[in-house]
C-alpha cells in the first residue's frame, strides 16, 4: 500500500512550545506541575505528560488541595496556561492562587487577543468566528470588554444587535473559506467592519494539504487526532468534502485492516495536537498491509 503523508501533519509550533515549557518545569524537579485544563486536546499525549508529573486541573475554586508557600515561590507548584489561552479574569484568578505562574498561550492566539483588546478600548464591538464553547474562544471573549459575540453562521450574524463599529476576528483553527464568506456578509450588514484574518498559518497549511492529498491520488484519507480537537475535526470534515472515504482515528488500533485493504493509495494527515509517535504508528501499520 502506498501512503501519502501530508507535509504539515502533527504538532504546530504553538503546541510544541507549550509542551516544551511545561516539560522544562517538570524536568527541573518542579513537581507537581499543573496545567489549567488539558494542555492540548490529545488524550494519549496527556497520558504521557501525566507520567512526567504534569497534572491537568479543572475549574477549581480554592487552594484547598494545592500546598502553596508564599515565602518560597521557587519551591511552589507551577501553574501553566495552556496553548489555547485564557481570559484576563481567569489569569488574575490563577495568579491569586499563589503558585508559580507560567503562560504557554500560543503567540498567535496572543496576537488575536491583542487586536481585540486594542479595538475594544476604541469602542469597537468584537465578532469572533468560532465555537463559543472552545477554550480559545472563551478566552478571547474576555478581552472584548463585554461587547463580544461568537458566531458560526450567517444566521448568527443576523441575530446580533445593531452594531456601528465592528472588529471581526477568527478562532485560529477555523475554516478559511467560511471566515471569508462570513466576514464579507458582516461587511454588508454593519456600517464599519474591520476584518483581521487570524486563522493561524499552521491551520491553513493543514487544510491546504488535505486538498493536496486528494489531488495526489489518495483514494481515502486517514485523519489522526483527538475527537475533541477542533482543528482535527475540521480536517476530517474538509477531507469528506473532497468526496473521499475519511477515517478520523486517535490511534493505529482503530484502523480496520479489512477496511483499509480496499484501497491502494491512502492519504494521512493529523491535527496540530497529534504527536509524531501516533502518526508514525499509523503510517507503519498502513504500509505493512
Curated annotation (Swiss-Prot):
This is 4-hydroxy-3-methylbut-2-enyl diphosphate reductase. GO terms for molecular function: 4 iron, 4 sulfur cluster binding; 4-hydroxy-3-methylbut-2-enyl diphosphate reductase activity; metal ion binding. Its cofactor is [4Fe-4S] cluster. [4Fe-4S] cluster binds at residues 12, 106, 200. Catalyzes the conversion of 1-hydroxy-2-methyl-2-(E)-butenyl 4-diphosphate (HMBPP) into a mixture of isopentenyl diphosphate (IPP) and dimethylallyl diphosphate (DMAPP). Acts in the terminal step of the DOXP/MEP pathway for isoprenoid precursor biosynthesis. Binds 1 [4Fe-4S] cluster per subunit. Keywords: 4Fe-4S, Iron, Iron-sulfur, Isoprene biosynthesis, Metal-binding, Oxidoreductase. The gene is ispH. (2E)-4-hydroxy-3-methylbut-2-enyl diphosphate binds at residues 41, 84, 134, 172, 229, 231, 273. The keyword Oxidoreductase applies. Belongs to the IspH family. One of its GO terms (biological process) is dimethylallyl diphosphate biosynthetic process. Isopentenyl diphosphate binds at residues 41, 84, 134, 229, 231, 273. The active site is at 136 (proton donor). It catalyses: isopentenyl diphosphate + 2 oxidized [2Fe-2S]-[ferredoxin] + H2O = (2E)-4-hydroxy-3-methylbut-2-enyl diphosphate + 2 reduced [2Fe-2S]-[ferredoxin] + 2 H(+); dimethylallyl diphosphate + 2 oxidized [2Fe-2S]-[ferredoxin] + H2O = (2E)-4-hydroxy-3-methylbut-2-enyl diphosphate + 2 reduced [2Fe-2S]-[ferredoxin] + 2 H(+). It comes from Opitutus terrae (strain DSM 11246 / JCM 15787 / PB90-1). Dimethylallyl diphosphate binds at residues 41, 84, 134, 229, 231, 273. Pathway: Isoprenoid biosynthesis; dimethylallyl diphosphate biosynthesis; dimethylallyl diphosphate from (2E)-4-hydroxy-3-methylbutenyl diphosphate: step 1/1; Isoprenoid biosynthesis; isopentenyl diphosphate biosynthesis via DXP pathway; isopentenyl diphosphate from 1-deoxy-D-xylulose 5-phosphate: step 6/6. InterPro entries: LytB/IspH. Its EC number is 1.17.7.4. The keyword Signal does not apply.
Amino acid at each position: 500500500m502506498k501512503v501519502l503523508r501530508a507535509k504539515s501533519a502533527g504538532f504546530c509550533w504553538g503546541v510544541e512550545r507549550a509542551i516544551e515549557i511545561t516539560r522544562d518545569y517538570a524536568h527541573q524537579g518542579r513537581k507537581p506541575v499543573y496545567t489549567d485544563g488539558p494542555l492540548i486536546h490529545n488524550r494519549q499525549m496527556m497520558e504521557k505528560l501525566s507520567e512526567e508529573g504534569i497534572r491537568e486541573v479543572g475549574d477549581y475554586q480554592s487552594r484547598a488541595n494545592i500546598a502553596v508557600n508564599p515565602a518560597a515561590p521557587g519551591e511552589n507548584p507551577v501553574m501553566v496556561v495552556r496553548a489555547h489561552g485564557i481570559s484576563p479574569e481567569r489569569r488574575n484568578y490563577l495568579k491569586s492562587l499563589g503558585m508559580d505562574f507560567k503562560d504557554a498561550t500560543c503567540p498567535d492566539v496572543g496576537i488575536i487577543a491583542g487586536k481585540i483588546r486594542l479595538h475594544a478600548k476604541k469602542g469597537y464591538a468584537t465578532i469572533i468566528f468560532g465555537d463559543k464553547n472552545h477554550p480559545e474562544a472563551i478566552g478571547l471573549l474576555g478581552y472584548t470588554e463585554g461587547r463580544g459575540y461568537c458566531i458560526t453562521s450567517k444566521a448568527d450574524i443576523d441575530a446580533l444587535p445593531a452594531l456601528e463599529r465592528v472588529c471581526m476576528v477568527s478562532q485560529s483553527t477555523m475554516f478559511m473559506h467560511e471566515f471569508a464568506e462570513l466576514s464579507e456578509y458582516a461587511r454588508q450588514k454593519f456600517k464599519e467592519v474591520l476584518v483581521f484574518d487570524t486563522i493561524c498559518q499552521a491551520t491553513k497549511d493543514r487544510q491546504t494539504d488535505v486538498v493536496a492529498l486528494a489531488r495526489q491520488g489518495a483514494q481515502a484519507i486517514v485523519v489522526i487526532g483527538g475527537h475533541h480537537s477542533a482543528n482535527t475535526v475540521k480536517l476530517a470534515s474538509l477531507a469528506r468534502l473532497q468526496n473521499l472515504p475519511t477515517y478520523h482515528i486517535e490511534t493505529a488500533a482503530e484502523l480496520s485492516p479489512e477496511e483499509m485493504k480496499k484501497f491502494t493509495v491512502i492519504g494521512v494527515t493529523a491535527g496540530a495536537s497529534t504527536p509524531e509517535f501516533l502518526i508514525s504508528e499509523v503510517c507503519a501499520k498502513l504500509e505493512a498491509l
